[in-house]
């Protein structure tokens, strides 16, 4: 039995080597076509080979060929062909029911970073990639993919969309560093506290206490316009500091007094009290209001934050009116 198993393993290794060799030979021919400028013919050949490999259940070969082809087309400025092959990479992942792995997420983030930021293909790609990365366990997408997308968007200085993806990652430190840059580059000095306050409140609405604490600590330590604290000069920052302590304690009386005492600061943004209603329910046992199914603006904001549908998520990441946009 052991000998038979060893022989089978060796045969499998030989077949795998032959398959890789075959893919490499085909890839060489396709690369030569692209180098010559025969973009259309090369694109059609990539598609033909993709469906041939998929029909033979050679999902990994199909995926690797489409990924390398997409990178090749991107390097030659062929955005449409590259985006099409990128979507085929996703199709191979979906149909093969491949488990989520860091390398795959990094590959998806790589092609995302090369896509034209204003192209509709990018919107479709990120929505579909996040849906696949959720693995059927949720609607928000894998935190690592969100982090990689956030980093790319940050480099593009697309701070609003970057913040959305940071909120759904576990990278509180990265989020804070991005917010420091966003605040100093685009914000008013009088609003330095509001940038981090909204991020903390939204992390708490997503039940992510750890990232809420990290983003607050990192932001207040690194922002050049915030003096050392706590306590802080800005009352709103003191409120957030006390709130994070109260969340750990879970005492409703403390939460209630805190919200009452800091109402002048909380009135600076009408959404603060709405977020705090939700935080009260999540961490302090506050019963939902009679109109528990939030309507109007808040309903849209919270459903988007909590990922009520994949479609909404894809749209949210491209919409400047998203719930995570700071005033």
From Swiss-Prot:
Claim: Glycoprotein is one of the keywords in the record: no
Top-rank taxon: Eukaryota
Localisation per UniProt entry: Cytoplasm, Cytosol
GO molecular function, one term: protein carrier chaperone
Keywords carried by this UniProt record: Acetylation, Cytoplasm, Transport, Ubl conjugation
Post-translational modification comment from the UniProt entry: Ubiquitinated by RNF12, leading to proteasomal degradation. When unassembled from BAG6; ubiquitinylation is modulated by BAG6 quality control role and effectuated by RNF126.
Family: Belongs to the GET4 family.
Function: As part of a cytosolic protein quality control complex, the BAG6/BAT3 complex, maintains misfolded and hydrophobic patches-containing proteins in a soluble state and participates in their proper delivery to the endoplasmic reticulum or alternatively can promote their sorting to the proteasome where they undergo degradation. The BAG6/BAT3 complex is involved in the post-translational delivery of tail-anchored/type II transmembrane proteins to the endoplasmic reticulum membrane.
Protein name per UniProt: Golgi to ER traffic protein 4 homolog
Source organism (scientific name): Mus musculus
Gene this chain is encoded by: Get4
């Amino acid at each position: 039995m052991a000998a038979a198993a060893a022989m089978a393993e060796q045969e499998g290794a030989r077949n795998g080597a032959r398959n890789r060799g075959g893919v490499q030979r085909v890839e060489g021919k396709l690369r030569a076509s692209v180098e010559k400028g025969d973009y259309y013919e090369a694109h059609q050949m990539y598609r033909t080979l993709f469906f041939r490999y998929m029909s033979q259940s050679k999902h990994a070969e199909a995926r690797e060929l489409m990924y390398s082809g997409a990178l090749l087309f991107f390097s030659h400025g062929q955005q449409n062909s590259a985006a099409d092959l990128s979507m085929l990479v996703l199709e191979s992942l979906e149909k093969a029911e491949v488990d989520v792995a860091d390398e795959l997420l990094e590959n998806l983030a790589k092609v995302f970073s090369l896509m034209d930021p204003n192209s509709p293909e990018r919107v479709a790609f990120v929505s579909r990639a996040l849906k696949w990365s959720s693995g059927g366990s949720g609607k928000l997408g894998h935190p690592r993919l969100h982090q990689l997308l956030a980093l790319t968007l940050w480099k593009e200085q697309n701070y609003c969309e970057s913040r959305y993806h940071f909120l759904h990652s576990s990278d509180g430190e990265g989020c804070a560093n991005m917010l420091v840059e966003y605040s100093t580059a685009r914000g008013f000095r009088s609003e330095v506290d509001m940038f981090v306050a909204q991020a903390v409140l939204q992390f708490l609405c997503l039940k992510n206490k750890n990232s809420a604490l990290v983003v607050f600590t990192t932001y207040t330590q690194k922002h050049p316009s915030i003096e050392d604290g706590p306590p802080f000069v800005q009352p709103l920052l003191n409120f957030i500091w006390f709130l994070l302590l109260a969340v750990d304690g879970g005492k409703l009386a403390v939460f209630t007094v805190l919200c009452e005492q800091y109402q002048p600061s909380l009135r600076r943004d009408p959404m603060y009290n709405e977020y705090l209603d939700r935080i009260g329910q999540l961490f302090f046992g506050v019963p939902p209001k009679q109109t528990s199914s939030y309507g109007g603006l808040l309903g849209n904001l919270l459903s988007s934050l909590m990922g009520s549908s994949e479609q909404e998520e894809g749209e949210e990441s491209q919409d400047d009116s998203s719930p995570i946009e700071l005033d």
